[in-house]
Amino acid sequence: MSGVLNDVRDYTEGYLQVLWQNRLYVYSTAAVLIGVWFTVNMLFKKKKMVHPVSPLASKSVKKQEPASEAKKVIYVSGVKVFYGSQTGTAKGFAKELAEDVIAQGIQCEVIDMKDFDPEDRLAEECTSKIICVFLVATYTDGQPTESAEWFCKWLEEASTDFRYGKTYLKGMRYAVFGLGNSVYVGHFNTVSKSIDKWLWMLSAARIMTRGEGDCNVVKSRHGSVQADFQVWKGKFLNRLQALAKGEKKACSGNCKKASCKNKKKHKEEAEDNHSLAEKNNSEEELMESSSDEESSSEDEKSHGSVIDMEDLGNVMNHMKKAKQRMEEDEEDSQRVKQNGERKSECEEERREMITPALRDSLTKQGYKLIGSHSGVKLRRWTKSMLRGRGGCYKHTFYGIESHRCMETTPSLACANKCVFCWRHHTNPVGTEWRWKMDPAEKIIQEAMENHRNMIRQFRGVPGVRPERFEEGLTVKHCALSLVGEPIMYPEINSFLKLLHQQNISSFLVTNAQFPEEIRSLVPVTQLYVSVDASTKDSLKKIDRPLFKDFWQRFLDSLRALGEKQQRTVYRLTLVKAWNVDELKAYADLIALGQPDFIEVKGVTYCGESSASSLTMANVPWHEEVIYFVQQLANLLPDYEIACEHEHSNCLLLANHKFKVDGEWWTWIDYERFQELIQQYEESGGTKNFSAMDYMAKTPSWAVFGAGERGFDPTDTRFQRKNKTKDISGC
């Protein structure tokens, strides 16, 4: 037995010794066999991936269709539209979008950001299969509106807070549309850009490119913010339909002949192009691309992403081509930008200032619009004086016949967005004239025709005095203070000359942001400058000017006013708790421009508006206005309170030069002014004249301290039984 075991052991040792001596050949054979097996396996796997579905398999799929239909997959369960609005535009867009989404058979909810707590509820949208839409406006200094302030604050902090993590909103799908004005350079649509960025940083998936609405019709891609939204809304609804059907992102058009036969391959190309964009573009530009590819690519990689050497070579080629295309596109864009500046300038100037939406809004407010940038409106005091119920404060201070005063403007655009704007910021804004321009002759002719037509509507109205009705058909005064900034109109001097040629006096109001235009202005009957605050900070807070150098422009405008020889006026609007505690600063500004008169008026409450935080609490009592003016007069040795109009909550400070032999001469001799301006024009501007040359005596009832308190005794005081607020202005 032991011998047999020895033989077996000897045989085994001999066999192993042979193998050891020939181990190199054994290893080589094994390596070849393994390589052949691996290659065959990979080839079989590749063929299986591209192999068409067999008829038998298709039959089995058809048999399973009823079961899949019974258990239908829901890709989009609904839409939530979040809005952050100040003037109501974003809110209106949100409601409009919701109606269109519901019309597609998809549930939709509109949510005001101020009523939504993102800390407790936003993460729920990651698993709800709901599409979140954010319609947000950019407010003062690039800040969010009051309603969106907390939402933005929380989202910004969460995007950089390690406790939330970078995947806090992973699974959430969203789209963003911003409302802004490109006139505010450096702050255009910053809120929408920030929200888009913060959501992306928390791994939320963008379903489409961020939309930007521009209130500046000159720069708006489609002519108005409403048109911008309509275009974006159409794209969103199409994208929503595709998502609801479970479709992936459509072909980008970069593939050959735009046919995506090999979807996987083209998606890889899109990812490669996207990665190149990430490397070459800034983070802000990255925000512009859709993140759909990112989410879909992750799904594909989870199924296995084995790439052989041939595919890797193709990918590298695609990356090189994509980089070349990007460089070429960048060069083309630079050439277009350089060569198209003059062309775009011309095209922008041809755009009309009044958009269809603005036209509808102003028409509802009672404006009679003229051409593409002008308007006329019947003043409240015009109607009052036609009935013999008293005139406006200009009648008390300067002798204007209110029923013969046409209130108009050749420019509905303004360079400020004042918090107390009695038009609730419905007018456009701008820092220079970039719109289509109508001739001055057309504006004046149509303004007078519209004014007369509005006067004619009072024929036969109870209480209207026949003699005043006939007088009202002939315009004697023109108040260029309706809305906007009339001095922006490039042909303002021609406009004023045409008024004077028709014996119409001119009262022009400017917001003190155009000093050069003030200097080059031809003589007017009376030139006003609005002085709404006395310090840089308070002026920025109240007027919200567009110019970055607004304070220097403001001071230069006051200096330019001081160079005028005709009648000049500072107009101060008192807003309680905003600008009533700056007496010394006001006195310094008055010394700078040395106006002939200073009007001090309590702010008029124009009703509740989302565009302003002012309430009735900000309206000073008349006694408070009197006290302010008395305190201001104590700081001004050359001025004294001359007139009062209690109904308008307004007082007039006048320079002592208009007090002759103890009596005030604040009224205007309008016939004498027309003679002087005619002589000035005939002499080519050499025969100048001053405010003292056409002053007239102020009646006793208009003087401060009189029992009438500024009410003309020839009229009858009328007290409304139903005291509704009038927002028609002065």
UniProtKB/Swiss-Prot annotation:
<protein>
    <recommendedName>
        <fullName>S-adenosyl-L-methionine-dependent tRNA 4-demethylwyosine synthase TYW1</fullName>
        <ecNumber>4.1.3.44</ecNumber>
    </recommendedName>
</protein>
<dbReference type="InterPro" id="IPR013785">
    <property type="entry name" value="Aldolase_TIM"/>
</dbReference>
<dbReference type="GO" id="GO:0010181">
    <property type="term" value="F:FMN binding"/>
</dbReference>
<feature type="region of interest" description="Disordered">
    <location>
        <begin position="253"/>
        <end position="351"/>
    </location>
</feature>
<keyword id="KW-0408">Iron</keyword>
<feature type="binding site">
    <location>
        <position position="421"/>
    </location>
    <ligand>
        <name>[4Fe-4S] cluster</name>
    </ligand>
</feature>
<dbReference type="Pfam" id="PF08608">
    <property type="entry name" value="Wyosine_form"/>
</dbReference>
<dbReference type="Pfam" id="PF00258">
    <property type="entry name" value="Flavodoxin_1"/>
</dbReference>
<comment type="similarity">
    <text>Belongs to the TYW1 family.</text>
</comment>
<feature type="compositionally biased region" description="Basic and acidic residues">
    <location>
        <begin position="267"/>
        <end position="282"/>
    </location>
</feature>
<dbReference type="InterPro" id="IPR029039">
    <property type="entry name" value="Flavoprotein-like_sf"/>
</dbReference>
<feature type="domain" description="Radical SAM core">
    <location>
        <begin position="398"/>
        <end position="642"/>
    </location>
</feature>
<dbReference type="InterPro" id="IPR001094">
    <property type="entry name" value="Flavdoxin-like"/>
</dbReference>
<dbReference type="InterPro" id="IPR007197">
    <property type="entry name" value="rSAM"/>
</dbReference>
<dbReference type="GO" id="GO:0031591">
    <property type="term" value="P:wybutosine biosynthetic process"/>
</dbReference>
<dbReference type="GO" id="GO:0051539">
    <property type="term" value="F:4 iron, 4 sulfur cluster binding"/>
</dbReference>
<keyword id="KW-0949">S-adenosyl-L-methionine</keyword>
<comment type="pathway">
    <text>tRNA modification; wybutosine-tRNA(Phe) biosynthesis.</text>
</comment>
<feature type="binding site">
    <location>
        <begin position="176"/>
        <end position="208"/>
    </location>
    <ligand>
        <name>FMN</name>
    </ligand>
</feature>
<keyword id="KW-0819">tRNA processing</keyword>
<dbReference type="InterPro" id="IPR013917">
    <property type="entry name" value="tRNA_wybutosine-synth"/>
</dbReference>
<keyword id="KW-0456">Lyase</keyword>
<keyword id="KW-0479">Metal-binding</keyword>
<dbReference type="GO" id="GO:0102521">
    <property type="term" value="F:tRNA-4-demethylwyosine synthase activity"/>
</dbReference>
<feature type="binding site">
    <location>
        <position position="418"/>
    </location>
    <ligand>
        <name>[4Fe-4S] cluster</name>
    </ligand>
</feature>
<feature type="binding site">
    <location>
        <begin position="85"/>
        <end position="89"/>
    </location>
    <ligand>
        <name>FMN</name>
    </ligand>
</feature>
<feature type="domain" description="Flavodoxin-like">
    <location>
        <begin position="79"/>
        <end position="237"/>
    </location>
</feature>
<dbReference type="Pfam" id="PF04055">
    <property type="entry name" value="Radical_SAM"/>
</dbReference>
<dbReference type="GO" id="GO:0046872">
    <property type="term" value="F:metal ion binding"/>
</dbReference>
<dbReference type="InterPro" id="IPR008254">
    <property type="entry name" value="Flavodoxin/NO_synth"/>
</dbReference>
<feature type="compositionally biased region" description="Acidic residues">
    <location>
        <begin position="283"/>
        <end position="297"/>
    </location>
</feature>
<keyword id="KW-0004">4Fe-4S</keyword>
<feature type="compositionally biased region" description="Basic and acidic residues">
    <location>
        <begin position="333"/>
        <end position="351"/>
    </location>
</feature>
<keyword id="KW-0547">Nucleotide-binding</keyword>
<keyword id="KW-0411">Iron-sulfur</keyword>
<dbReference type="InterPro" id="IPR034556">
    <property type="entry name" value="tRNA_wybutosine-synthase"/>
</dbReference>
<comment type="function">
    <text>Probable component of the wybutosine biosynthesis pathway. Wybutosine is a hyper modified guanosine with a tricyclic base found at the 3'-position adjacent to the anticodon of eukaryotic phenylalanine tRNA. Catalyzes the condensation of N-methylguanine with 2 carbon atoms from pyruvate to form the tricyclic 4-demethylwyosine, an intermediate in wybutosine biosynthesis.</text>
</comment>
<feature type="binding site">
    <location>
        <position position="414"/>
    </location>
    <ligand>
        <name>[4Fe-4S] cluster</name>
    </ligand>
</feature>
